[in-house]
Amino acid sequence: MMIGATSETDYELLQVTEGLYRKFNLRRVFFSAFVNVNQDKNLPIKEGEGPPLLREHRLYQADWLLRYYQFEAHEILSKDNPNFNLHFDPKCNWALKHLENFPVEVNRADYHTLLRVPGIGYTSATRIIKARRLGDLNFENLKKMGVVLKRALYFITCNGKMMYQTKVEEDYIARNLLAVKEKLPREVLNMNYRQLSLFDTNTAYSLLK
């Protein structure tokens, strides 16, 4: 799917993506930021211009949420909020906007709920479900299971206690999360327009933990 050649919002692109999965049972949708390589006046943007590569990256992250994290397009974006937050990945942004669902008790939450916690990926969520059958988990256990505690600590409790005394407030959590530098692909950091690898799914997955 070409990104930035026309005026579609991220929400519209994500709706189309969701529709392709549901109606045509596609296994994967790919995105590519539009790059104008000549000065043809019929092209939508000038040579050398193009959408931020971070936008393409956010679409891949949201696509991952649709395919593996049981999200729906309308939960990630909406008509009132049609474009991605450039500061936070889609999963983290969703959590910040739905703090009424947090903190989550990791020793009691079901798999679906764990998937929505920033810092918990589907592998670590599966490990949590299996491990807690043997007893209650603590934060050290979670760290060993691959939970990214520097992100998750604002959204979870272990045996009713948070890792640190912290406020469950959007502004407070957002400020602290901004201090945790997001790991972005080199191409995005450089803000050039070389297309990301269609087969590098590890990067998208790691950023949704």
Predicted regions located by residue number:
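Residue-level signature of tetratricopeptide-repeat
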Residues: 131-132
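Conserved strand-turn element in the central/C-terminal portion of the radical SAM core barrel
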Residues: 1-10, 32-37, 45-53
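Conserved, mostly hydrophobic/aromatic
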Residues: 62, 128
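A glycine-rich phosphate-binding loop feature that marks nucleotide/adenosyl-phosphate handling sites
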Residues: 34-39, 75-90
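C-terminal extensions
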Residues: 83-113, 139-209
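Catalytic cores of alpha/beta
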Residues: 6-21
